[in-house]
Amino acid sequence: LVNSKIEKTITEGICFHVEVQDLDFDFINDLDWVIILGNVLDNAIEAAAETDTKFLFCGIIKDNDFLTILIKNSCKSQIINIENLYQSGHTTKGDGHGIGLFNARKILSQYPDILHNTNCNNNYFLQQLKLPETFTSKGKRVNISAV
């Protein structure tokens, strides 16, 4: 997934920094993982491509008792109404769009212990997911360090 996004950033002329530790993601359904990360990265690439800075960072790291997934990209807007982004049908792209982040949030609701934070500040958009070392995945307790 990340490799295909790297190719897209090269095509768009985006400076893409990636920091991914060798981690096992068996605790999240593969399709859920692809939908969440794919939508967030696609939106980040599209937003970064519209800026002069053209910057994107993707970090997936285990730090202390958390697995942290961080996506940060340049964007044109200083301030974005974050709640609107997650409404079904909300889009800046035209017809046939506006379900990606809505679906991502719906999937994330199945993992109640995943902390999801979205922020826009100083022309940078940030999405952060934090998974505690032990959390609930679709009704089952999972320990990341045991995965």
Label every PLM stretch briefly.
Residues 1-12:
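Short beta-to-alpha transition helix within the HATPase_c
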Residues 16-37:
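Conserved short strand/loop->alpha-helix "switch" segment adjacent to the catalytic nucleotide/phosphoryl-transfer site
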Residues 18-22, 62, 75, 120:
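Heptad-repeat coiled-coil segments of the DHp/HisKA dimerization-phosphoacceptor module
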Residues 30-52, 110:
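Conserved ATP-binding N-box helix of the HATPase_c
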Residues 51, 55-65:
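Short beta-strand/loop element within the Bergerat-fold HATPase_c
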Residues 67-98, 142:
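Glycine-rich/acidic phosphate-handling loop/turn and adjacent ATP-lid/helix
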Residues 98, 120-128, 134-135:
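Glycine-rich nucleotide-binding loop
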Residues 103-115:
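Conserved glycine-/histidine-rich ATP-lid loop and adjacent helix of the Bergerat-fold HATPase_c
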